[in-house]
Structure formats: C-alpha cells, structure tokens
C-alpha cells in the first residue's frame, strides 16, 4: 500500500495548516487521487493492523439500510458510538440514503438495488452512481457523509469503482474507506457476473489531524508488506444476502496497531 504512505507523506510535507470543525486543527491538501488494482491483492494497510471486523460489519450495516448502532454494537463494532443519540440513532445517514432515498412525491429509491440492476442490464451506462449527500437532510444527520458519492464503470468484463470523499481523515478514516469500497466493488462484481477491476479513491479535503502527526510519522518508518487476498463465498449472488461469514482475508500480515484519538 505504497499509495497510502505517499498520501501521508504528501500531506505532511506540502499541506496547509488549517482550523476545523472539531477544534483540533489539521494539515490538509485539496484534491488527491489513489488507484488500486484489485487483481493485485486486497488493499488493506500492512503498515498498521486494521480491525477488519469493523470494516466488514459497517459495510453490511450500510447495505441493510440501517441507521441505528444496535447492529454494530451487537457485533462488537464501536466506530459510530460517538455520534449516536441515547437511543442509538444517527439520523438519515449512509444506509438510509443508499437504500431509501426520499423523493419529493413521497417515494423512496433503493439506489443499491437500482445500481445492481443497471449494471446487469446496461453495463455501458454512465449513470451507475450512488449518492449519500442529500442536501435536504444533511442537517438531520449525526455526521454528514464524508464518502459521499461513488460511480461504477464496466470495461472488458471488469467492474471498477470511483469514490469521491469530500472529507478524508487520512490517518484513521481513509484506511477503512479504501478497504470498505474495495470490498463493495468485489461484492458488486460477484453478483453482476463481472471481475473486480480498479478502485479509484478521489479525496477532496484530505487532512491529517494535529494530534495524529506523531503517529503518521511512525507509520512512515514502516515498510509495506505483500497484500493479502480477500476470498468471498462464491455462492452468494444477491448483494443483500452477504453475511460476515462469507468473507475471509487470507495471508494478512501487518505491523502493530497505532492508536490515535478520534476528532468528534
């Protein structure tokens, strides 16, 4: 995952120091892109160990259309706890927008179902897009979507995905986002009869929080290891039927975890 270390180094050396919503302060750049060929291994960091369980369960939670942290907590995932209210609710966040986008006439659009159907029936379309950024509901969300829009593209029997991320917490969030959307691309490829191609990650405000500088410098001293392979149960043909047990990361070797505080 040299691409990720290059991003860290680029922001540390060329970024601008700025204030931010959390009051922590950041160093950031505006506009950055990484590309990962999914045939070359699963793009998960090897220079610090990631909690893959959290990544998989969060993605399955999104695909359920869920907006309550109960499912996550039941599965030992706490990454959304800081933003949930006393009942575990987060408002109309990712899952709601993906699966139940509200229209002015009272209907709801299942963007994921429409995406899969479109890829099967009209793969050359340039409209294979899912948006989580709903201006009418942003103020009702506990945390407006950081990874807010993604598009799929089919060529030569391969499915590629490009994500636009408006706000990118490089040290804590981006490694999760890379693995999550790479996995989503593989899942969608499987259920549409395609091979996984590239995951393209486009960042808007790409930032490192001030209280992550030391951890980022430590990570830059580490050498990337070979990428592992993600094996997915080939029997699953419906995007909404995947379960945690359908995924196995084979050959994952990583350096020790590096702790860092979350800016809320």
UniProtKB/Swiss-Prot annotation:
* InterPro entries referenced in this protein's UniProt entry, alphabetically: Thymidate_synth/dCMP_Mease, Thymidate_synth/dCMP_Mease_dom, Thymidate_synth/dCMP_Mease_sf, Thymidylate_synthase, Thymidylate_synthase_AS
Gene3D superfamilies (alphabetical)? Thymidylate synthase/dCMP hydroxymethylase domain
Coiled-coil residue windows: none
Per UniProt, (6R)-5,10-methylene-5,6,7,8-tetrahydrofolate binds at: 51, 169, 263
GO terms of biological process kind: dTMP biosynthetic process; dTTP biosynthetic process; methylation
User: What organism does the record attribute this protein to?
Assistant: Rhizobium meliloti (strain 1021)
Keywords on record: Cytoplasm, Methyltransferase, Nucleotide biosynthesis, Transferase
* Function per UniProt: Catalyzes the reductive methylation of 2'-deoxyuridine-5'-monophosphate (dUMP) to 2'-deoxythymidine-5'-monophosphate (dTMP) while utilizing 5,10-methylenetetrahydrofolate (mTHF) as the methyl donor and reductant in the reaction, yielding dihydrofolate (DHF) as a by-product. This enzymatic reaction provides an intracellular de novo source of dTMP, an essential precursor for DNA biosynthesis.
**What pathway is this protein said to act in by its record?**
Pyrimidine metabolism; dTTP biosynthesis
- Any one GO molecular-function label of the UniProt entry: thymidylate synthase activity
Q: Where in the cell is it found?
A: Cytoplasm
- Cross-referenced PROSITE patterns: THYMIDYLATE_SYNTHASE
* Enzyme Commission number: 2.1.1.45
Which residues make up the binding site for dUMP? Answer: 21, 126-127, 166-169, 177, 207-209
By which gene is this protein encoded?
Answer: thyA
Protein name per its UniProtKB record: Thymidylate synthase
Q: How does it assemble?
A: Homodimer.
Q: Which residues form the active site?
A: 146 (nucleophile)
Q: Which family does it belong to?
A: Belongs to the thymidylate synthase family. Bacterial-type ThyA subfamily.
Please state the protein's primary subcellular location. cytoplasm
- Identify the taxonomic lineage of the organism of origin: Bacteria, Pseudomonadati, Pseudomonadota, Alphaproteobacteria, Hyphomicrobiales
Reaction(s) the record says it catalyses: dUMP + (6R)-5,10-methylene-5,6,7,8-tetrahydrofolate = 7,8-dihydrofolate + dTMP
Q: Could you tell me the superkingdom of the organism this chain comes from?
A: Bacteria
Q: Which PANTHER family match?
A: THYMIDYLATE SYNTHASE, THYMIDYLATE SYNTHASE 1
